[in-house]
Structures are given as C-alpha cells and as structure tokens.
C-alpha cells in the first residue's frame, strides 16, 4: 500500500472521530516546556485543525522554565516548598511580564495565515480575559506562599460565550482576586479546574514522554483513575511536583477524571502529530485516563483460563469455535491475548506460530454484550503486531461463519493445499472451515 493510499484510507476512517469531536469542549494544557520545544509550531497547526473541525478549545499555557530564566537573569532567588514556587511581590512583577509576553506570542502564532502555511485561511480568533478567580494558597507547614495562589472559581459561562462565538479561549497561569490582586497559579491546576467546570469532553495534557510508562519502559496506553492513583502513591509528593512533568499531569488527569471529565489524554509535546494520532486513530499515541467503561488489552496469564473458558463456551456449543479443554488452554495460554474490563474477560484471541514465516490467528471471541464495538479489530491489530514482532510474514485463519469479517480486513481466500504443511495435517474436514491468509507489512 503506497503512502497516498494509506493517507486516503486513514482520512476515510477518521470521519467517525471528526463527527464525535465536533462541538465538544476540549481543554488543552500547554506547559512552558511545550512552548519552548521546536515542535510547538506544529502543535499550533494541529490545534488549528481541531478548531476548523468544530472542536471548542480552551488553551491553558504555563511558563515554569521561562519564569525561572527571567527570575535567574534578574538575580532573583528561586524559592520552592514541596515543589511549588513561593511568589513574592518583586518576583510577581517579573512573572507578569514573562507570562504576558508569552500569551501575546501564542496569539501571534494563531494569527498566522500565509499562503504557504498550514494556517492559510484559518482566520482564528483568540480570546483572553479574567476568567479565573484565585485566592492565596496560604501558609503550609509554616511556609507562607505569599502571592502563589489556587483556583477559587472558573467563570465557565463567560468562557462558553466566547467558544460559541467560534473563538479559541487562551488562559495563562495567572489568576485574579475580587480585591484586585494577581496570583501566580499552577497551569496544571487551572487546566484541571477549567475542564471540570466546563464539563469538558477531554482534558489534553502535553508531557515530555509518550504518556505514562511502566517499570519496564512500556507505554501504558490506558489507565483507570484508580490505577493511576496507585502509581502516584508510590512516588513522594515532592517528586511528583518538582521532578517529572508527566507525573504532575497524571495527578491532574486523575482529579479531572474523578470529577466531570470523561477522558484525559497525556501525549508527547516532542512527537510531530501526536495530537492528531491520539484523537483520530484507534490506537492513539499516549496514555488515556478514564473511568468510563475502563478496559485494557493485555497478554493472557494462567489466572485468565477460567474467564476465557466461560467466554468461549457459548461459541463452542454453537459450533463456531473448536472445543478447548482447560488443560489445553492452560498449556497454550501464552499464545492468548485478552481484553479485561473491571476484572472481567470480555474478549480473547490467540496467535499460534506454525512455521518460521506463518502464524495462525484463532479463538477470537467477544462477549455478547460488547460486540459491534471495534474490539475485534483491536484484538486483530494486536495479534498482527505480535506476529510481526515474532518475525512472521503472514497469518492465516480458519473460519466457518465469519469469512466476510476477515475479507473486510485484508484477508484473502486460499485453498487447503495452500496452508502450511503442519496445518494441512491438522485440518478438520468435518468442520469444512474456509481458509484465509493475510500478508503482514
């Protein structure tokens, strides 16, 4: 498949996401590290694309490294307690100058419209205002945070009025009090509280890495708030605040998910197109934190045998699947992948290597309450990825009742004599299954 064909195929399949995202409110956190990265101009283009597709966008920008540079250049001491900046009046003046200049620069980027740029014809309007009411953080452990503040109230109604006028709303890390004071806030705190107040469909947080990884360095593509909280509990609070922007954002995602925000996404600000990949492809790019119908696809273990047997039993009785005993399933469990939802196995499938080049996909089963939901495609992609990882060049499948499903996913019919010799010897002529093959790329 050439690049043009791949692009056309992806664009067609993105229509369901375009329709799902239209008129929804997304809150996007742009940390100071995000703004400083070379990829930020492309992030602006991708955000502009979302706007053109009808997404209502609230952008919250931080300025932590830029503020540090400004304070250091002025010879001002950087003071922190528990990872949070202590802001005095002199420092606040420098912070206001720095943040104000950054907000203007962001507006300028969204105002671009040169004929040879992706922004041509966008005509984006950016609105700013005193939408965030703040209060002082106060004294903690005997330490006075002075003009460091926290969100007291979000004027969600006023923000929505600007969104309804087709504007992008831009917020900084500054908040304002009814007495006319200005406070230095955490951008993560503002983004979280705005997303909650707006009942946003998504909170999108740009982080240094591709989301959250486990101890083996493997991406955790989905997390429930409970699982995310468990990860955060293993890390001292000071480290969460001061040493890892991903962990700060993960804590924000947990808070938002436990309130009114359906989905929180942690994606890399360094990867070109990460925002588009996360929102318009099934596999995404980073980590999704959500408590809605939480499920995850993983390698099966011996503890899953009972759940798999319960899942496949009705299909075996109907003659759709070949019968597997508990002993056989225990012996072959390493070939299986499962989708687990809240402790229940709702789908499974297996990939059996037949020779050095070919594997067999088998035992695809999905719980009757969760069919017609794309989980079969999710499993199939995972098995194909596993086959490629094992160095296989093609996969086969034998089926009695789902031939068209496999044809629609790139499989081609073959004769029994075209099967690998090992599979020919095991072929059950009584079942009379049809055989299909798919070349892997």
Q: Where are each of the predicted segments found?
A:
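Polyanion-binding loop/helix "lid" in catalytic or ligand-binding cores
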Residues: 88-118, 156-157, 163, 170-194, ...
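A conserved beta-strand-loop-helix scaffold within acyl/acetyltransferase catalytic domains
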Residues: 323-367
């Amino acid at each position: 498949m050439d690049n043009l064909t791949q692009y056309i195929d992806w664009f067609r399949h993105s229509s369901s996401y375009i329709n799902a995202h239209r008129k929804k409110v997304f809150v996007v956190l742009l940390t100071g590290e995000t703004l400083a990265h070379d990829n930020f101009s492309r992030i602006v283009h991708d955000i502009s694309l979302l706007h053109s597709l009808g997404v209502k966008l609230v952008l919250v920008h931080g300025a932590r490294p830029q503020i540090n540079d400004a304070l250091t250049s002025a010879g001002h001491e950087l003071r922190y307690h528990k990872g949070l900046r202590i802001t005095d009046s002199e420092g606040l003046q420098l912070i206001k100058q720095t943040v104000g200049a950054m907000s203007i620069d962001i507006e300028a980027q969204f105002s671009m419209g040169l004929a040879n740029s992706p922004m041509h014809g966008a005509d984006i309007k950016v609105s700013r205002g005193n939408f965030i009411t703040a209060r002082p953080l106060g004294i903690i452990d005997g330490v006075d945070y002075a003009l460091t503040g926290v969100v007291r109230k979000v004027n969600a109604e006023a923000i929505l009025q600007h969104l309804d006028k087709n504007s992008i709303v831009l917020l900084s890390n500054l908040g304002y009090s009814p007495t006319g004071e200005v406070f230095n806030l955490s951008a993560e705190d503002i983004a979280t509280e705005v997303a909650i107040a707006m009942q946003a469909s998504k909170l999108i947080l740009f982080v240094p890495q591709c989301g959250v990884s486990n101890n083996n360095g493997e991406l955790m593509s989905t997390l429930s708030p409970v699982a995310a909280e468990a990860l955060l509990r293993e890390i001292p609070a000071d480290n969460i605040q001061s040493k890892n922007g991903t962990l700060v954002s993960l804590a924000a995602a947990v808070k938002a998910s436990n309130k009114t925000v359906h989905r929180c996404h942690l994606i890399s600000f360094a990867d070109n197109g990460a925002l588009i990949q996360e929102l318009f492809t099934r596999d995404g790019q980073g980590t999704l934190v959500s408590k809605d119908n939480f499920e995850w696809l993983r390698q099966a273990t011996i503890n899953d045998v009972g759940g798999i047997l319960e899942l496949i039993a009705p299909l075996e009785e109907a003659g759709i699947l070949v019968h597997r005993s508990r002993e056989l399933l225990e012996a072959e469990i390493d070939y299986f992948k499962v989708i687990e939802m809240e402790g229940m196995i709702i789908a499974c499938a297996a990939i059996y290597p037949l020779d050095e080049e070919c594997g067999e996909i088998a035992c695809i089963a999905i719980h009757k309450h969760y069919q017609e939901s794309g989980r079969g495609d999710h499993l199939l992609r995972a098995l194909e990825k596993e086959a490629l990882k094992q160095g296989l060049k093609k996969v086969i499948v034998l089926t009695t009742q789902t031939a068209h499903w496999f044809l629609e996913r790139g499989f081609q019919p073959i004769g029994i004599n075209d099967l690998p010799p090992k599979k020919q010897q095991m072929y059950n002529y009584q079942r009379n299954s049809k055989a299909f093959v798919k070349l892997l790329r």
